[in-house]
Each structure stands twice: as structure tokens, then as C-alpha cells.
Amino acid sequence: MTKTRHLTILGSTGSIGESTLDVVARHPGRYQVVALTADRNVEKMFEQCIQFHPPYAVMLDAQSAEQLEDRLHAAGLDTRVLSGIESLEKVASLPEIDTVMAAIVGAAGIRPTLAAARTGKHILLANKETLVMAGRVFMDTLRQHHATLLPIDSEHNAIFQSLPQHFNGDLAGSGVRRILLTASGGPFRTVDLKILETVTPEQACAHPNWVMGRKISVDSATMMNKGLEVIEAHWLFNAVPEKIQVVIHPQSVIHSMVEYIDGSVLAQLGNPDMRTPIAHALSYPERMESGVQSLDMFKVARLDFESPDFKRFPCLRLAYEALAAGGNMPAVLNAANEVAVEVFLAGRIPFTAIPVMIEDVMKSTERRDVPDLEGVLLADLQARATAREWLACNIRQSTGQPGKPASSLSAGQ
């Protein structure tokens, strides 16, 4: 009989969190949800608490925590409601927890994910920033405390499934020639470059294959998402940048591939649904039903591949440059991107200004080593401050109106 796993889901109201709970609900008795966490989505958290009855619920925002507590009390639930980053760390390291789904988007997910690593948990990692910003710190912590890690990103999960079962971090010793990291190319893969200057947030968030949150949808449109995944792959699989090849694959059916020295290429295929990697990681080394439909190869009919265009997708180039530089630069890249995407979604800069802001912040930041979490978080804070300064210098303020993009912000000018 399969042992019941006790779960904390960090970021339960986001797309990954909801997909995780969908899979969990299909297997009653196999998983017990001990803690759910969110930022400020009280309504969705309330619904999840009603369905799963977790002993703990954490809202990062204190006011949202108060609202949730009132609603749960009125509903007769005895779920304990906590708030703040320290509470996220607490529920990620509870002694009764064995598995943590790390699905908080952004730098806010680093501290609770590290807390899970320090207490030897089985970590299902969907938070890119933990590896992008603090890869060395996080991997060292995993080893030191004998925590285990399985990737949730569909691409890294596909790579994991395509590597030898007992892969020990030695690609060459395992006969691996290179990793082929697939990318859909996003909604603007074939759009005229001039049109990109007028792209709206709604257009950028309309991914052709995947259903995702707004931030990651914009990252997919700029291919920064793929750039961050290159950095993740470096840490997850001990791969130098030259061994990680990005391949644009518009159908999003092949989720990634591993090429071996004998010429073999192993790939993981499936419908574009995050429940597949989630179910794989939740049940590993077994397999279980995810709710995902079978892949109809006759309906797919064809598989296309293209090389990425750095002119169209400068964010991908910037990610490779940050990885090559090392030290604080991946954290700087990530912080500048988070600010740029935030202000783009707010309508304050054009789509084409996102890579301009990121590159300017990177160029104005001195490369430094970051041996610990404090150094990583400091690099993050400083890069965000630099990005805000850049924004202040490049946005014209109009009385009574939101800031308007300056004409000089377009990448083509």
C-alpha cells in the first residue's frame, strides 16, 4: 500500500497550485494537504480550504489573512491562518510535512523553498527563481541536508525523464552529448518585429498552447521564460551553457530531449498540460492518473523545429550572458525582468522596452560573487532599485495620467 504523503503547497492559488490540487483530488487517501499558501487571493484560498481542510493556511498579506480567518471561522473550519514570509517558511518546514510543492512565482518563493531544503523535505520545484537567483546556495543546501528535488517545469521534468534513472550529475559520464530544451516561441514567433512595439498586455498573455499566469505568459512571449529555464537546467543537471540548446517547437508536444553520444535522442512527449509533470513528480518513482488526455499523434500530424532568433528574442540572449557571467548577474537579470514585466502589464512601458530595461540594468551593475542567501537577496534589492531608477528616467509623467512610455524606449530606436 502506498504511504500517504503530507503536503505543503506554496502558491496554491496560482496555476501550478490549482493543477496540483486537481491531481491530489483524484487520489483521495494518497495525499494529505497540511498547508496551503497564497499572496492575497482570499476567495480562491477560502474555496480550497473548504475542499481540502488543511490544518494551516498562510496569506502573505496580513489584511488578506484577517479576511480569510473571519470567513473560515464563519464557515466552522478550524484551519489556522497565518501571515507573512516567516509563516511561509514555517509551513514549508513543519515536522509532519514530507513533500513541498514550491510554486510561488517570483523571488518571494526563495526563502520558503530554502526552508524546505534545510529541513530535508522532498521538494517539487516549480519556482524558477530559486535556482535562477540562488542556484549554488540552493543546491549546496539540498546536499547538506539530504533533501531531494524533482523539477516541475515541463521541460526540466522531460529532461529528468529522458536521463538515465540513476543520473548522478555527470552528463559526460552518462553518455550525454547535449540537452535540447524546447520552446513554443510564444504568441509572437512569426509577428513582424515592428508590430511588437504596439503589443498589449492582453496579447502578450494569450499563449497559443499553455494556460498560465500573466507574469509567466509575458516571460514566454519574450522568451525570458526559456532563458530562465536554461539557467535552471545548468543547476539541475550540472550542464555548461554550451551543452544546453534551445529548440523552438511550436506544437509544444515534445517537452524536451536529451541527445546521447551514440546518436540517440530520447524525448518526453505529451499534451501541454502541467498536470503531467505534477503527477509524475508527486508519484515518482511510480506513475498515476493525472487527468490529462492521451496524446493523439494523428491529430498532431506534424512536429516542427526552428532555431531561436536572438534579434526577435533578446531576453534569451541576456539570460545566456547572465549565466556565463555568474555571480550576482542571474539575480540581477531576474529582478530587472520582474520589474519590467510588472510595469509592462501596468501599461507603463511598451513590450519592446522589457529587454532594453533588463540589459541597461545588467550593464550598470558590477558583477560580484554571492556566496550566501543574504548576498543573493541584496543583489535582488539593488537590481530592483536600479530598475526603478531606470523607469523614473525613461517615463514621462503627465499630470493626472499614468506614466507614458518615452519614445526612446523602443528596442528598434
From Swiss-Prot:
Do you know which Pfam families this protein is assigned to? DXP_redisom_C (PF08436), DXP_reductoisom (PF02670), DXPR_C (PF13288)
Cofactor(s) annotated in UniProt: Mg(2+); Mn(2+)
Q: According to the UniProt entry, what is the EC number of this protein?
A: 1.1.1.267
Which Gene Ontology BP annotations are present?
Answer: isopentenyl diphosphate biosynthetic process, methylerythritol 4-phosphate pathway involved in terpenoid biosynthetic process
Q: In which pathway does it act?
A: Isoprenoid biosynthesis; isopentenyl diphosphate biosynthesis via DXP pathway; isopentenyl diphosphate from 1-deoxy-D-xylulose 5-phosphate: step 1/6
Q: Which residues bind 1-deoxy-D-xylulose 5-phosphate?
A: 128, 154-155, 184, 207, 220, 225-226, 229
Q: What does this protein do?
A: Catalyzes the NADPH-dependent rearrangement and reduction of 1-deoxy-D-xylulose-5-phosphate (DXP) to 2-C-methyl-D-erythritol 4-phosphate (MEP).
The record, for PANTHER family, names: 1-DEOXY-D-XYLULOSE 5-PHOSPHATE REDUCTOISOMERASE, 1-DEOXY-D-XYLULOSE 5-PHOSPHATE REDUCTOISOMERASE, CHLOROPLASTIC
Regarding protein family, the annotation reads: Belongs to the DXR family.
| Record protein name field | 1-deoxy-D-xylulose 5-phosphate reductoisomerase
Look up and give the organism this protein is from: Nitrosomonas europaea (strain ATCC 19718 / CIP 103999 / KCTC 2705 / NBRC 14298)
